[in-house]
């Protein structure tokens, strides 16, 4: 008898988690949904029955006993507060926030890359990587296994759903506000008022913002998204000295993050070898031209535009493009795949 809980069940990623649990016929006999007091009491249909959403703020260790796996997508603050409570009650927590990713006692797992790390639980918590890192890992791990990864230069083009519902609503409202005046931007970037900038530094509609995430106050002038890319790649791949530089860009796309990756290796690796490796890789689909629209709604990371990097000698460099659904594999799916590993 397996009991699973979804914490943050009414949020953007929580909704995808619920859908995937049904689609994948997750082997749970009992399912419990938790959310903030604002959503508590609401009834959600799941597998033909209605489940009442429980108030996370009222949870106690006693009331949580019997839960085997808890899937968290309620934000870092809630995770820090409640994940240890669920773990103390006997659940294994799989957390989708950034709260635990840097903790040396919490494994950071991509299901296709380092599943065995689930056996190294100290706190009863497993962390899910950032959605941008997630898209790249199933692609980079088999290439690393073949040629030894030593350096990454990455530019990411991140969808507004990565900013939560506020990002989605901001883009939709700005497009509507500009309306038929959009063509006037051809000659004048100030020709129409897009309205409130929402969670961004400038209007996102008809624009590109080379500033995804929040500025880290450590003198590097990097955003937290850029630092996550570096820190998480090192931890997941088990390469603490991997050199990683990145620029994270927010683009007016609803769902689907795209990355251009310049990868340098210790050994030579040709385009043909890379294509053969990636064609057989789990969680990867080899395509000619990856796009966020094509990636939205599917499980795999799309990879294509694979070229030899002419700036790296001896065929030790590759350039490639990756697109992945930041809500699906980038958040909800990997969380559930980890849960599937736990209940096998």
Swiss-Prot record:
<feature type="binding site">
    <location>
        <begin position="10"/>
        <end position="13"/>
    </location>
    <ligand>
        <name>NADP(+)</name>
    </ligand>
</feature>
<feature type="binding site">
    <location>
        <position position="326"/>
    </location>
    <ligand>
        <name>NADP(+)</name>
    </ligand>
</feature>
<protein>
    <recommendedName>
        <fullName>Aspartate-semialdehyde dehydrogenase</fullName>
        <ecNumber>1.2.1.11</ecNumber>
    </recommendedName>
</protein>
<feature type="binding site">
    <location>
        <begin position="38"/>
        <end position="39"/>
    </location>
    <ligand>
        <name>NADP(+)</name>
    </ligand>
</feature>
<feature type="binding site">
    <location>
        <position position="101"/>
    </location>
    <ligand>
        <name>phosphate</name>
    </ligand>
</feature>
<feature type="active site" description="Acyl-thioester intermediate">
    <location>
        <position position="131"/>
    </location>
</feature>
<comment type="similarity">
    <text>Belongs to the aspartate-semialdehyde dehydrogenase family.</text>
</comment>
<feature type="binding site">
    <location>
        <position position="158"/>
    </location>
    <ligand>
        <name>substrate</name>
    </ligand>
</feature>
<dbReference type="GO" id="GO:0009088">
    <property type="term" value="P:threonine biosynthetic process"/>
</dbReference>
<dbReference type="InterPro" id="IPR000534">
    <property type="entry name" value="Semialdehyde_DH_NAD-bd"/>
</dbReference>
<dbReference type="InterPro" id="IPR012080">
    <property type="entry name" value="Asp_semialdehyde_DH"/>
</dbReference>
<keyword id="KW-0560">Oxidoreductase</keyword>
<dbReference type="GO" id="GO:0009089">
    <property type="term" value="P:lysine biosynthetic process via diaminopimelate"/>
</dbReference>
<feature type="active site" description="Proton acceptor">
    <location>
        <position position="257"/>
    </location>
</feature>
<dbReference type="InterPro" id="IPR005986">
    <property type="entry name" value="Asp_semialdehyde_DH_beta"/>
</dbReference>
<dbReference type="GO" id="GO:0019877">
    <property type="term" value="P:diaminopimelate biosynthetic process"/>
</dbReference>
<keyword id="KW-0220">Diaminopimelate biosynthesis</keyword>
<feature type="binding site">
    <location>
        <begin position="161"/>
        <end position="162"/>
    </location>
    <ligand>
        <name>NADP(+)</name>
    </ligand>
</feature>
<dbReference type="InterPro" id="IPR012280">
    <property type="entry name" value="Semialdhyde_DH_dimer_dom"/>
</dbReference>
<keyword id="KW-0486">Methionine biosynthesis</keyword>
<dbReference type="InterPro" id="IPR000319">
    <property type="entry name" value="Asp-semialdehyde_DH_CS"/>
</dbReference>
<dbReference type="GO" id="GO:0071266">
    <property type="term" value="P:'de novo' L-methionine biosynthetic process"/>
</dbReference>
<keyword id="KW-0028">Amino-acid biosynthesis</keyword>
<feature type="binding site">
    <location>
        <position position="228"/>
    </location>
    <ligand>
        <name>phosphate</name>
    </ligand>
</feature>
<keyword id="KW-0457">Lysine biosynthesis</keyword>
<comment type="pathway">
    <text>Amino-acid biosynthesis; L-lysine biosynthesis via DAP pathway; (S)-tetrahydrodipicolinate from L-aspartate: step 2/4.</text>
</comment>
<feature type="binding site">
    <location>
        <position position="250"/>
    </location>
    <ligand>
        <name>substrate</name>
    </ligand>
</feature>
<keyword id="KW-0521">NADP</keyword>
<dbReference type="GO" id="GO:0009097">
    <property type="term" value="P:isoleucine biosynthetic process"/>
</dbReference>
<dbReference type="Pfam" id="PF01118">
    <property type="entry name" value="Semialdhyde_dh"/>
</dbReference>
<comment type="subunit">
    <text>Homodimer.</text>
</comment>
<dbReference type="GO" id="GO:0051287">
    <property type="term" value="F:NAD binding"/>
</dbReference>
<dbReference type="GO" id="GO:0004073">
    <property type="term" value="F:aspartate-semialdehyde dehydrogenase activity"/>
</dbReference>
<dbReference type="GO" id="GO:0050661">
    <property type="term" value="F:NADP binding"/>
</dbReference>
<comment type="function">
    <text>Catalyzes the NADPH-dependent formation of L-aspartate-semialdehyde (L-ASA) by the reductive dephosphorylation of L-aspartyl-4-phosphate.</text>
</comment>
<dbReference type="GO" id="GO:0046983">
    <property type="term" value="F:protein dimerization activity"/>
</dbReference>
<dbReference type="InterPro" id="IPR036291">
    <property type="entry name" value="NAD(P)-bd_dom_sf"/>
</dbReference>
<comment type="pathway">
    <text>Amino-acid biosynthesis; L-methionine biosynthesis via de novo pathway; L-homoserine from L-aspartate: step 2/3.</text>
</comment>
<keyword id="KW-0791">Threonine biosynthesis</keyword>
<dbReference type="Pfam" id="PF02774">
    <property type="entry name" value="Semialdhyde_dhC"/>
</dbReference>
């Amino acid at each position: 008898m397996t009991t699973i809980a979804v914490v943050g069940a009414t949020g953007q990623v929580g909704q995808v988690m619920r859908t995937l649990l049904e689609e994948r016929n997750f082997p749970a006999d009992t399912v419990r949904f938790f959310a903030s007091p604002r959503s508590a009491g609401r009834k959600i249909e799941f597998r033909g029955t209605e489940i009442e959403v429980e108030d996370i703020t009222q949870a106690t260790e006693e009331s949580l006993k019997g839960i085997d796996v808890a899937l968290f997508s309620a934000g870092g603050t809630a995770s820090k507060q409640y994940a240890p409570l669920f773990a103390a009650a006997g659940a294994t927590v799989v957390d989708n926030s950034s709260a635990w990713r840097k903790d040396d006692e919490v494994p950071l797992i991509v299901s296709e890359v380092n599943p065995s790390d689930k056996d190294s639980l100290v706190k009863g918590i497993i962390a899910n990587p950032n959605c941008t890192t997630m898209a790249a890992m199933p692609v980079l791990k088999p290439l690393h296994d073949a040629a030894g990864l030593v350096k990454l230069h990455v530019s990411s083009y991140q969808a507004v759903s990565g900013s939560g519902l506020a990002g989605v609503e901001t883009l939709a409202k700005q497009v509507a506000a500009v309306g038929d005046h959009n063509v006037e931007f051809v000659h004048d970037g100030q020709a129409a008022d897009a309205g409130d900038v929402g969670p961004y530094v400038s209007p996102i509609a008809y624009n590109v913002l080379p500033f995804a995430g929040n500025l880290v106050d450590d003198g590097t002038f990097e955003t937290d998204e850029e630092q996550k890319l570096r820190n998480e790649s090192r931890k997941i791949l088990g390469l603490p000295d991997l050199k990683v530089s990145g620029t994270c860009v927010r683009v007016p796309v609803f769902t689907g993050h795209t990355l251009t990756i310049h990868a340098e290796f210790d050994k030579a690796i040709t385009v043909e070898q890379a294509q053969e490796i990636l064609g057989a890789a789990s969680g990867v689909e080899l395509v000619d031209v990856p796009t966020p629209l094509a990636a939205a709604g599917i499980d795999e990371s799309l990879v294509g535009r694979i070229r030899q990097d002419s700036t790296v000698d001896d065929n030790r460099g590759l350039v490639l493009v990756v697109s992945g659904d930041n809500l699906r594999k980038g958040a909800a799916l990997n969380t559930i795949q980890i849960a599937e590993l736990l209940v096998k």
